[in-house]
Regions:
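A short His-aromatic
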Residues: 1-2
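Conserved catalytic/acceptor-binding region of the Class I
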Residues: 6-7, 13, 19-82, 101-106
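Conserved Class I S-adenosyl-L-methionine
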Residues: 53-137
Length: 137
């Protein structure tokens, strides 16, 4: 979520004690892609992310960025998925995202919830593409 990843990493390297470890997590471009498709199916104008944060620092490029600042970078992918069978928690999650969805959904909450309930005729498996990197100077 920082604007200048390299500047933030420079500062972390500066203050990290000898023997210290930075552990950071991130996600990839396919993380929760089913939710984005679900929302887009309701209204194509909705974007759940204001910025594609995974493009600034994600699974596809994070270790390369970290290796510019740290001599030892170990990446571990976290294999996981989420199975959702209730509409209300999913709708609440969607409304909590950092995009423009509130602009289009707040006044249509009931209609959108019915749309999600219909789409959840059976449990939905949601891709979770995430991982962590452990970094040493």
């Amino acid at each position: 979520y920082c604007k200048n990843v390299n500047k933030a990493l420079d500062e972390i390297v500066r203050v990290l004690k000898p023997g210290g470890v930075l552990v950071c997590s991130t996600y990839g471009s396919r993380h929760m892609q089913e939710i984005s498709r679900l929302v887009s199916g309701y209204d194509k104008r909705i974007a759940l992310e204001a910025d594609k944060l995974f493009e600034k620092f994600g699974l596809d490029n994070g270790d390369k960025i970290l290796k510019k600042h740290f001599s030892d970078v170990e990446r571990r992918d976290y294999k996981d998925a989420l199975v959702v069978d209730e509409a209300e928690p999913l709708v609440d999650y969607i409304l909590s995202c950092h995009g423009n969805q509130k602009e289009y959904l707040v006044d249509k909450y009931t209609d959108f919830k019915k749309y999600v309930e219909k789409k959840l005729g059976k449990p939905m498996t949601i891709t979770k593409e995430a991982g962590v990197c452990a970094c040493r100077k």
